[in-house]
Amino acid sequence: MLLHGVTISFAVISGEFIWVDIMRYIIAVPTYNGGAVWRESAKNIIAFGAESQFVYVIDSGSKDDTLNVAKSHGFKTLSIESKDFNHGGTRNLAVENNIDNADVIIFLTQDAIPQPGFLEKIMAAFDDPAVACAYGRQLPHVDANPLARHARTFNYGATGYVSDMGSKDTMGIKTVFTSNSFSAYRVSTFKEIGGFPSSTILAEDMYFAAKAVMAGYKVAYCADAVARHSHNYSPAEEFKRYFDIGVFHQDEAWIRQAFGGAGGRKEIYSFGTELLIKKCAALDSYGMY
């Protein structure tokens, strides 16, 4: 149950309610020119269970009303220069600035629109003390094109699971799939692992998940915790994203070496400084969509 910035777990023993655990949360959202979709996201964050004082927005110099939207909902805000934004580093800053106020940090992107129950259902993953991070199901936006819908269907099924090092033979690199568009991290483990890298161009979430699993922790996929999130990329944008994913896996080759390819298959081939992907569906399995 939710109560004033915490989730409370309880059990019924001999007909009596026994409090089991109390966990404090902060929802952190990096923003930049969020527009109409951010307005809807901010509205739903509050409508579906979060309290405004436990939402923390880091804005990278928006020129529109993004910051005003955050303030109008009573969110805490921090403004940084756009040149200082970094996918990993900015999220690390959100954790550092709330490290004494939360047991779990929930990350949303400005274009992820939470759905009913998103908060308590992703927090429930941390009832297992071995879970280091969790991520929710992403359904496509109502205006998503076929490729965007495919990506969400392929990566975000209706059945949740928990993965650990023992999962790699069957799941391969999907063992450490996660997405910071809608994710949550146990603060104590986040500190222990060292947080996100600040040097990667993307996939700071998979990087952390891989480190955590290799350290003996688990990753939870919470299929009943839902947000709407997708991108209608142009062909050029799709190419750039896939190229960047290839660069990431070349730079962080230890992840593939530890976990293999999708479903345990080795599906990436090296050619000079580029990585060629066998097919888009296989690439989606590498966890950056």
What role is predicted for each listed range?
Residues 33-48:
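Short, well-formed alpha-helical segments that are part of the catalytic scaffolds
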Residues 59-67, 112-113:
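A conserved acidic beta->alpha catalytic loop
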Residues 81-98:
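Glycine-rich, basic loop-to-helix element that forms the pyrophosphate-binding segment
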Residues 102-113:
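Short beta-strand-to-loop acidic/aromatic patch adjacent to the donor-nucleotide binding site
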Residues 117-149:
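Conserved donor NDP-sugar-binding/catalytic core segment of glycosyltransferases
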Residues 154-175:
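Short, flexible, basic/aromatic active-site loop/helix in glycosyltransferases
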Residues 202-208:
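Acidic donor-binding loop at a coil-to-helix junction in glycosyltransferase catalytic cores
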Residues 241-247, 251, 258-289:
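Non-catalytic, C-terminal membrane-associated alpha-helical segments of glycosyltransferases
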